């Protein structure tokens, strides 16, 4: 059973673009009755000057003043968006590279989940920035990439390998929390299953083989839908997994996509070109990644 037990950590800037991220983090923390921590990462501004010790003191005071100003600004924004007050909110100020600071803060507080946002491209689309990409890749806990999303279904992807099932558990828990229907999706891409060189030497697999595999996967999907009581049913799509998942999310106007990062057929890890990363980068809604061991 999927359950977040540690505090929720969210990374926040000092602009209104972080409000949606903060709202989703606050809702997650309230649902699981855990503490909410907000992280802000300052650039590394404390220089090492062994020959001028007085400058160390001056710069330390500047950093102290800056951190105090940032805390005040963050707390004001948090109050406006969530109505939270200390001690119901904790603020973590880190220095250095942004993604490293977020990951460090998550480890320090034993985060149960991290909530981050992406960035908006020139076309107004929400895409995954390099900071979010690093956090999704290396965090030791579930990561919610928060985006403005329609109020549709929760869509959980699976390749039916044992490590992938906790992602469906997470999807079920999120569907219950959001009062939404859960839909489970599996994509049939026969060529990677057979061999990356199969088509080059033998051509496309016979249609009868495709039909047999489709029948087999449909049975497994039906069993999965029944086992997890997925009210939104199951979707079996042909073709590469990432485009199939993204297309289904758009068609269903999904409010959340859930993917695991340790399945066998492309969900094995979040690395360049993998199914999980492609989904996180281009999804039209929020995405929850569940790290599976």
Residue ranges and their predicted role:
Residues 91-93, 143, 234-236, 287:
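Conserved beta-strand scaffold positions in the cores of enzyme catalytic domains, especially
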Residues 57-72, 203-216:
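A short acidic, glycine-rich active-site loop
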Residues 4-6, 22, 27, 31, ...:
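Gly/Ser-rich helix-loop-strand patches that form or flank binding pockets
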Residues 93-101, 236-244:
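Charged docking surfaces used in two-component/phosphorelay signaling
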